[in-house]
Curated annotation (Swiss-Prot):
Name of this protein: Adenylate kinase
UniProt lineage: Bacteria, Pseudomonadati, Pseudomonadota, Alphaproteobacteria, Hyphomicrobiales
Species, as recorded: Brucella anthropi (strain ATCC 49188 / DSM 6882 / CCUG 24695 / JCM 21032 / LMG 3331 / NBRC 15819 / NCTC 12168 / Alc 37) (Ochrobactrum anthropi)
Gene from which the chain derives: adk
UniProt entry keywords in alphabetical sequence: ATP-binding, Cytoplasm, Kinase, Nucleotide biosynthesis, Nucleotide-binding, Transferase
NCBIfam families for the chain: adk, PRK00279.1-3, PRK14527.1, PRK14528.1, PRK14531.1, PRK14532.1
GO biological process, one term: AMP salvage
Binding site for ATP: 10-15, 127, 178
Job description of the protein: Catalyzes the reversible transfer of the terminal phosphate group between ATP and AMP. Plays an important role in cellular energy homeostasis and in adenine nucleotide metabolism.
Amino acid sequence: MRLILLGPPGAGKGTQAGLLTKKHGIPQLSTGDMLRAAVAQQSEIGKRAKAVMDAGQLVSDEIVNQIVSERIDAPDCANGFILDGYPRTVPQAQALGTMLAGKGLKLDAVIELKVDENALVKRMESRVAETIAKGGQVRSDDNPEAFRKRLVEYREKTSPLSSYYAGTGELRVINGMAPVEEVTAEIERILVPA
C-alpha cells in the first residue's frame, strides 16, 4: 500500500496515518523526520541538507526528492508507506511519480481529507484548552493567528495538489469532519474495495 494523505493542518492526517501504520505495518514517512535522519547519519545528501538548513534556507526540492527516494528504498517500505508532508507542491508530485515509475512502483491512492477551515480553528482551540487543562505543553504554533497563517500557506502552496492528482485519477476525497472511526473506515474502503 503506497499512499499520500492530503489535507490542511489539523485535518487529522497524522491521526489517520498512525492508525493505518498500526493496522497495516507500513511506515509513515514524514519529510521532517527523513531530513533529520539524513542529517544525523551525515550521509552525503544529509550534509547538503544540513548546510542549507544551517544557512536558514528551505531545503530544495532536489534534496528532498533524493531523501524521499532513498527512504522509499529502505526494507521497511517493501510493503508500502504513507507519505506525510510530501509532496507539498505539484513539481514535487511530478518528481515523485517519475521516481516511483523508475522503481517500478505506483501510488495506490491519494486521499484528501476535506474539512471546514472554521471548524478546524475551533478544533485547534479545543485541543489547546484540553492540553492546558491536562497541564501539558502547547505548541508555539497552536494559536488562532499562527494556525490561520498555516491554513493560508496550505491553500496557496499545497492545495493545487488536489487538482493535479484529480487529473491523474488517483485522488479520493473523504469528509475529514466525520468522526475518526468513520474516516478510517472510508479510507479502508478505498484501499481495500469490496
